[in-house]
Regions:
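A detector for small-residue-rich transmembrane helices and their helix-helix packing motifs
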Residues: 1-158
């Protein structure tokens, strides 16, 4: 989770983590003020582990398989943030903005499709399971997030 294949891989993870991580850290500070830092670090480290577990079990007997990066944990941070701000625009390629909940659907679809093909040496299932971890963890930590999630999307669609 802390080693990356190359500078580009590291850059995109850090870039994404910076923008979404700061926002999620602020949410943790508001919701859990006395333990926010510890809980946030625990959330991130658990996301690294949980996101890679399915791949570990799938590939445990394959000595040629390698997986690097923190993309699963970054996906957890992004999806946890989307739960709180589903209508905030996420800009693809710097200029094409789409609401977070639509991005989440597209990202999930892309990760599932690419994982089926798995020809590009990217651990797409880590992205998928990291995203799932972010959703499940935030639901367990703050179940009320779903009320706000639905209200924001409903208000946007009016």
């Amino acid at each position: 989770g802390f080693i990356h294949a190359d500078f580009t891989h590291l850059f995109f993870n850090l870039f994404s983590f910076f923008f979404f991580g700061v926002q999620l850290e602020q949410i943790f500070n508001q919701l859990f003020p006395s333990i926010a830092s510890e809980l946030y670090i625990l959330f991130y480290v658990l996301a690294i582990v949980v996101a890679d577990l399915p791949t570990f079990f799938k590939q445990k007997n394959n000595p040629n398989y390698n997986s690097l990066g923190a993309s699963g944990a970054v996906s957890a941070v992004i999806f946890a943030g989307i739960l709180f701000f589903p209508t905030e625009k996420i800009y693809l390629f710097g200029f094409f903005g789409i609401p977070g909940f639509i991005y989440a659907g597209l990202f999930t679809w892309y990760s599932v499709e690419m994982d089926k093909r798995s020809r590009d040496f990217v651990n797409h299932s880590a992205h998928l399971y990291g995203a799932l971890f972010g959703i499940v963890a935030m639901t367990l930590l703050y179940p009320q997030v779903w009320i706000s999630f639905v209200e924001q999307i409903t208000a946007m669609l009016r």
